[in-house]
Amino acid sequence: METNDGFLVINKDKGCTSHDCVKQIRKLLNTKKVGHTGTLDPEVIGTLPIAIGSATRFIQYLPQSKTYIGKIKLGIRTNTDDIHGEIINQKSWPKISEEKLDQYLKRFRGIIKQVPPKVSSVHVNGERAYKKSFRNEIFELAPREVKIKELTLMKWDQINGIITIKIKCSSGTYIRAIARDLGGILNSEGCLLQLKRISACGFDEQSSIKISDIEKAKKNAPKFIIPTISALDHISTYSLNKDEEINYWQTGRAIKIDINFLYECKAFDYKQPLKVVDSRKMLLGIGFLDDDHTKINPKLVLNAK
């Protein structure tokens, strides 16, 4: 089956790993160069963007925030920090109002430090934490800084001790850790009951598709692929209109920048990436302004010579 470079936004089912999805897409599209943009736990459903072909090189330039809707069960602590783990403690939960509960949630908004679950893909001395955990090894994980951009209380089921939240966060945030820690500050216990990712890396569930639908499409499956350049709409664009400039770019040489661009472009900070295109709006790669803002230095070059 023929394929195009770009992104497939998979609506992942429960029980399927992110790597399982990648393997299925490789087989369906008959291409080896496939990678996902961030692991979803097997029990988590929802949006899983998958890069195809040269799009795998652009993953780091996608928006990094992700949005979830999750349910937290108070009163239960497990060894995995979700409902599927072994119960290690149970405790009653407080009978508080939504307003009071939201006050507690405020502690998780902004930049916070969290200790990842021990059953996680975090590396510990060169090995995944979950492997050590499954061997019942004793180890500690260091707190990591994450950013919670939005955290909304959607529902508080006080009778059953279930909190429904919507959360927009940085890459690397563990919602299981938030469930565990929220239970702790409420003088109870907490674990993640259910989680759905509704957006990731600039893609949302409206643009997602089930792998079963891709299978049904067969040779027409590439029609679901979103072009790489469309996934980079959040990045300012610089156009190369001369063959000489394009040749310079494709041979890895810096391009002298048009001064008028600096007045129109939002990204004056040389640390911000620019997507470089030709006169037909075909993507040529990613570059960065130099310290003097006089040239664009190539960082990622498609069709390099």
From Swiss-Prot:
<dbReference type="GO" id="GO:1990481">
    <property type="term" value="P:mRNA pseudouridine synthesis"/>
</dbReference>
<dbReference type="Pfam" id="PF01509">
    <property type="entry name" value="TruB_N"/>
</dbReference>
<comment type="function">
    <text>Responsible for synthesis of pseudouridine from uracil-55 in the psi GC loop of transfer RNAs.</text>
</comment>
<dbReference type="GO" id="GO:0031119">
    <property type="term" value="P:tRNA pseudouridine synthesis"/>
</dbReference>
<keyword id="KW-0413">Isomerase</keyword>
<dbReference type="InterPro" id="IPR014780">
    <property type="entry name" value="tRNA_psdUridine_synth_TruB"/>
</dbReference>
<dbReference type="GO" id="GO:0003723">
    <property type="term" value="F:RNA binding"/>
</dbReference>
<protein>
    <recommendedName>
        <fullName>tRNA pseudouridine synthase B</fullName>
        <ecNumber>5.4.99.25</ecNumber>
    </recommendedName>
</protein>
<comment type="similarity">
    <text>Belongs to the pseudouridine synthase TruB family. Type 1 subfamily.</text>
</comment>
<dbReference type="InterPro" id="IPR002501">
    <property type="entry name" value="PsdUridine_synth_N"/>
</dbReference>
<dbReference type="InterPro" id="IPR020103">
    <property type="entry name" value="PsdUridine_synth_cat_dom_sf"/>
</dbReference>
<feature type="active site" description="Nucleophile">
    <location>
        <position position="41"/>
    </location>
</feature>
<dbReference type="GO" id="GO:0160148">
    <property type="term" value="F:tRNA pseudouridine(55) synthase activity"/>
</dbReference>
<keyword id="KW-0819">tRNA processing</keyword>
